[in-house]
């Protein structure tokens, strides 16, 4: 075990017979008018084209497609960043990474997380009297006060980071494949640096590790059951509730086994997409059964598909980033091309959100924070600025106006982490830095700086294939506008009360339920 014996923090295991032993469902304080329950479901690495309602070629999302027909579908909805931790931090704070401090992903050994002076959506609603729960992927810090149990969630059940950041006994399908957890104390290591073999993937309930390694093949159903049970209990408490579900899907490894289990077959991805769709359907069915008239269900993706996983990655739909593919590399996850941050998104609230509506409003994950806070009758945290806006008028079909301007930060493909290198202005998009992420063929597009930005008209060129001619009147009219809005936001960020995340690493903070077992192995009942 080496350093595990000496350095890994021992996390005690407590197996409770009660599902929510630490959640207080009782009513306290004065009685208020009914406030909506909130269910946020965030898919992982799901492409815009993975939603059947978006892309006719997709036939595997019957529950989500039904939700789209019964609610609102957003076709110009964007992640706040193109990778996991920054996107999730922005969802929970309404602020870009340059403000909240989270500009790239946290590691298994990360000491820090989302800065503690940043206020999360769960903390705001908890203070407003909501009972709160998070189920699934967190990826905003797991050590000490960065754990979700200390960030506003009364209950937590899930994996603290991505489900490929630890070995398992049933490793599922990955590209390249990763081995199962070692069963002996040998020093063998997989030569692929993307595979984890030292420490098994942990499953938490509140502050306790309840399974390590987690059984990925049963994880989706566990998440569904915990979500359904929380909704059932919370709906009878007399208090409004917030449920945030961070899905393990569609991130590799894919754990389902379709009839023809060829690791290179798109059938694997489709089977996993169907499993995710079923999970979402179970949550929606429970909402419909116990809290239909007073619950907003908001579904979205955290970023685009992970193209380097080849056939185990999703579909960008028409947003193929052709200019970048001609330069090399992928225009999907980690990049500021549309395929990296334009994500599927749906809102469902019978009687409030109109039925079978497609919204073209320019929206972002950043907007969930201020919108939900407004619906809950709470107040935004003071002494800081927000990049998201209250879009409840859009949700209720009273407006098609969202943002006029969005900024897309570097998420690992080119440039400095978090830097605002791309500007969306109405139907136009300007790139000051371009670069491709690692593609299926292993290629990475070169980092290129554009003093005069590349500007694309997305209305005419969704594939981002041909930028405007720099000498054209259209380009010359746009250039000063783009330059000005970028300068304005950078000055606004400089004047803001911004945070800085701690990205230092220490092996001793690695989640481990039993450092005396190879890979920290322990199972329920041991």
Curated annotation (Swiss-Prot):
Role played: Displays arylsulfatase activity at acidic pH towards the artificial substrate p-nitrocatechol sulfate. Catalyzes the hydrolysis of the 3-sulfate groups of the N-sulfo-D-glucosamine 3-O-sulfate units of heparin.
Pfam hit, one: Sulfatase_C
Catalytic activity: an aryl sulfate + H2O = a phenol + sulfate + H(+); Hydrolysis of the 3-sulfate groups of the N-sulfo-D-glucosamine 3-O-sulfate units of heparin
Keyword tags: Calcium, Disulfide bond, Glycoprotein, Hydrolase, Lysosome, Metal-binding, Signal
Protein species of origin: Rattus norvegicus (Rat)
Protein name in UniProt: Arylsulfatase G
E.C. numbers: 3.1.6.1, 3.1.6.15
3-oxoalanine (Cys): residues bearing it: 84
GO cellular component, one term: endoplasmic reticulum
Subcellular location: Lysosome
Binding site for Ca(2+): 44-45, 84, 302-303
């Amino acid at each position: 075990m080496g350093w595990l014996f000496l350095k890994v923090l021992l996390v005690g295991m407590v197996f409770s017979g009660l599902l929510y032993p630490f959640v207080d469902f009782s009513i306290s304080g004065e009685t208020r008018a009914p406030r909506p329950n909130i269910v946020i479901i965030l898919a992982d690495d799901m492409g815009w084209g993975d939603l059947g309602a978006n892309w006719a070629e997709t036939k595997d999302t019957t529950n989500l497609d039904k939700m789209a027909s019964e609610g609102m579908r957003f076709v110009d909805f964007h992640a706040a960043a193109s990778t996991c931790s920054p996107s999730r931090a922005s969802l929970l704070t309404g602020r870009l990474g340059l403000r909240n401090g989270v500009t790239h992903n946290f590691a298994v050994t990360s000491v820090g997380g989302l800065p503690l002076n940043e206020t999360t959506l769960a903390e705001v609603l908890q203070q407003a009297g909501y009972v709160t729960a998070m189920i699934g992927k967190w990826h905003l810090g797991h050590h000490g006060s960065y754990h979700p149990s200390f960030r506003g969630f009364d209950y937590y059940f899930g994996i603290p980071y991505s489900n490929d950041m630890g070995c398992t006994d049933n490793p599922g399908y990955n590209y390249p494949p990763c081995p199962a957890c070692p069963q002996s104390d040998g020093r063998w290591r997989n030569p692929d640096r993307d595979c984890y073999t030292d420490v098994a993937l942990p499953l938490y309930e509140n502050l306790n590790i309840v399974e390590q390694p987690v059984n990925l093949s049963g994880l989706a159903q566990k998440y569904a059951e915990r979500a359904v049970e929380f909704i059932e209990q919370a709906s009878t408490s007399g208090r409004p509730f917030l449920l945030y579900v961070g899905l393990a899907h569609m991130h590799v490894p894919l754990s389902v086994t379709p009839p023809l289990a060829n690791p290179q077959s798109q059938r694997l991805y489709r089977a996993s997409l169907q499993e995710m769709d079923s999970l979402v359907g179970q949550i929606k069915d429970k909402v419909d059964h116990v809290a239909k008239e007073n619950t907003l269900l908001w579904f979205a993706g955290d970023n685009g598909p992970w193209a380097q996983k080849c056939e185990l990655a999703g579909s960008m739909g028409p947003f193929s980033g052709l200019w970048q593919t001609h330069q090399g590399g992928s225009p999907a996850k980690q990049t500021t091309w549309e395929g990296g941050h334009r994500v599927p998104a749906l809102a469902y609230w019978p009687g409030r959100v109109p039925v079978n509506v497609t919204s073209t409003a320019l929206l972002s994950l950043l907007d969930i924070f201020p919108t939900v806070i407004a619906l809950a009758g709470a107040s935004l945290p003071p002494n800081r600025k927000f990049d998201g806006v209250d879009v409840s008028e859009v949700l209720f079909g009273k407006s098609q106006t969202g943002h006029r301007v969005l900024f897309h930060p570097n998420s690992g493909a080119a440039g400095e982490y978090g830097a605002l290198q791309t500007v969306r202005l109405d139907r136009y998009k300007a790139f000051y830095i371009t670069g491709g992420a690692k593609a299926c063929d292993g290629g990475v597009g070169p980092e290129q700086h554009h003093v005069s930005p590349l500007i694309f008209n997305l209305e005419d060129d969704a594939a981002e294939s041909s930028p405007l001619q720099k000498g054209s009147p259209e380009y010359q009219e746009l250039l000063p506008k783009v330059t000005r809005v970028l300068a304005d936001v950078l000055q606004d960020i400089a004047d803001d009360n911004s945070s800085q995340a701690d990205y230092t690493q220490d092996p001793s903070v690695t989640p481990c339920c039993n450092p005396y077992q190879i890979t920290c192995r322990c199972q329920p009942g041991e």
